[in-house]
Amino acid sequence: MAEITASMVKDLREKTDAPMMDCKKALTEAGGDMQKAEEILRVRFGNKAAKSAGRVAAEGVVTIAISPDGKSAAMVEVNCETDFVAKNDDFLALSAALAEMVLTQKPADVAALSALPYKNSTVEGFRTELVGKIGENMSVRRFVRLDGQGKFASYIHGGKIGVLVDVTGDEAIAKDIAMHIAASKPKSLDASGVPQDLLDTERRVAIEKAKEAGKPEAMLEKIAEGTVQKFLKEVTLLSQPFVKDDKQTVEQVLKSKNSQCHGFTMYVVGEGIEKKVSDFAAEVAAAAKV
């Protein structure tokens, strides 16, 4: 059996970025053949990736890229299982690169993005290797690419909330509006963007509450309309009190700066993903089976 030296392990680790112990095991299995050991690691990481694929990836980051002229922008959400991995340098570098790829190469969907070249492989190939190295599932969840009427401003809060806002006019106020959106989480720019079924639900609830309170039948529609209007002010960007000056609405602030907001997009990491909950004993039992 060939002697496995520390230098060989180091060289294989530098080539594959795999953990030291995995490198040593692969070299031993390959009888010291570096190329065969590298192939073993690729297979092993692939197997690890397959094991991780069924686990819920509800943490992660949002990354943004904006063209030099500010007219186009892209935003990507990449998920992983734990916040610890969301801070991994390779994971963050991949996530940032994906936003640039979406901006410049305009892939049609996640599958097309995953097939693009990245670091002597493809996005999907690198993702699979990274899953194997880290031992956690990760996935490109969604992205958006936008062409604006004005210029895009952006805001990312802790890597977890990302906002793109399209504004004509004052660039400083555009940045403030992006921060406002992250804090207040409006559902749409104005009333025209709020789904009718959402308004119908608010109206029905308001009528039922008014009935239970003993309000006269003749007043029910008026009460419901008042409730809906209040709801619209709470969930539409232009009607919301501005976070930096709640005596003015966002619309009033924009007008005071001779600016106009054309639209926005917000991503919240893990939004809509059901996180798997398990107790400590179950986690230990699951780990013992791996």
UniProtKB/Swiss-Prot annotation:
Localization (cell): Cytoplasm
Chief localisation class: cytoplasm
Domain of life: Bacteria
Region spans: Involved in Mg(2+) ion dislocation from EF-Tu: 82-85
Disulfide bridge positions per record: none
Keywords: Cytoplasm, Elongation factor, Protein biosynthesis
Gene Ontology, cellular component aspect: cytoplasm
CDD domains on file: UBA_EF-Ts
GO function term, MF aspect, one: translation elongation factor activity
Annotated family: Belongs to the EF-Ts family.
Function: Associates with the EF-Tu.GDP complex and induces the exchange of GDP to GTP. It remains bound to the aminoacyl-tRNA.EF-Tu.GTP complex up to the GTP hydrolysis stage on the ribosome.
Classification via PANTHER family: ELONGATION FACTOR TS (PTHR11741), ELONGATION FACTOR TS, MITOCHONDRIAL (PTHR11741:SF0)
HAMAP family xref list: EF_Ts
Protein's UniProt name: Elongation factor Ts
Species of provenance: Thiobacillus denitrificans (strain ATCC 25259 / T1)
Source lineage: Bacteria, Pseudomonadati, Pseudomonadota, Betaproteobacteria, Nitrosomonadales
Gene: tsf
